[in-house]
């Protein structure tokens, strides 16, 4: 009775002498007749704003359904404006005569700002969960105007100021069509296709040594499509599918960098797999083949890759299990690095694309032991990855002492990760602590260098559930790795957060990197034999960052039974080298 909405009641009958249809021993019946709602709606918003800097993200959305159809519309706005990010860099260049030339670059003043808009209109038709058809049209607009960095340059005995300016503007409409059909209780078909257009205009200026300015007018068109058939047979489940992607890029570089890049990239991938269970053993066995056809300004290649995959999970007892996964796949280079353009980075360095880059073969192994009971969740995980003929950093020193960075296919990159995790409920469903840690080992085998590096990582958290309140704390020591000739560190992170739920509202307040007014965001070392660089980046706005999140949701009427989308395709790469 308490769950009834009085607005839905059409008539109430009081039956004083009910018949046998209501059962024996029934003295009277109250018959409440309601009308079924054929439509409904949902509206909501999700807003996040930094209270210590100009940064925010906000979304509003609405859904309306009637019968088997639902329309939804959402709009997202995000942006930032910061002045607190600065870096300092020391560089040592070994010249052709064997002497060393030193340059220091220190940021004196910076301004970074950007704004992004995205709107999305979606129509969904669902016949319970047997058939789902969904189509959506979205548009994104991004603008980052008039950003600049003023640097103090110490070039040998010479000291001066240099200014770097850049601007970036893009818009991107996309059409997404999704279909799911439960053909029979055991068979299903899923398909998804996404078409995207990206238009980008960028401008860059830097006057270290001498003025250097260029603009880029970029146009990108892509089609991503995938279809999967699944049949749940008695001994196992069989699935097969095909994935196709096409991307056309036309980027025109004007000014001091002059080039017209036209790229066509086609990739076709087909696979089949079975998964099932034999007593305590769950298994997945499959294989696929991919074919890549690539052309750019007279450069072309065809590339085939075999994709075997195996996954085994053995339940040792009620709480302990062991799993192993193996797979091989292709790894395509970032599209921007396959262009034939050459861009000046500073007075001594250039970045050059390589149209002859080919994909690599990646082989992955993962072994895991896990244990779970009512209060403890723990696992030990080992991961090893081998990249054969990967795209690796290559530096060339010219006769006039210019240093050119590019990528070429070289010998091998390997990565080893070993980690352990444990989460424990100190008070069941009330207070939980968790921690993980391990090591990460990188191996880089180039044609003319070998670099290896070992790093350690850890993270810990504590969460308290106090009715409608939730309190959280998290800390880690950052991320360290070495790829090619670049050793990098992403800053340590810590945050405390409190959240509260009240009716249709959710509130949360977070404090990131507390008591740190000059947060170290990153550090990078370049280890080339002829070029050593050490760069450290600091961010004032990321230290002592206080953010407030408010979300609200209201639903009325009938709810639309739409199945979860099983395939999600998306393209955002404009292929512009920077």
Please place each PLM-identified region on the residue numbering:
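Membrane-proximal, glycine/serine-rich, low-complexity loop/turn segments characteristic
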Residues: 1-149, 164-196, 230-240, 306, ...
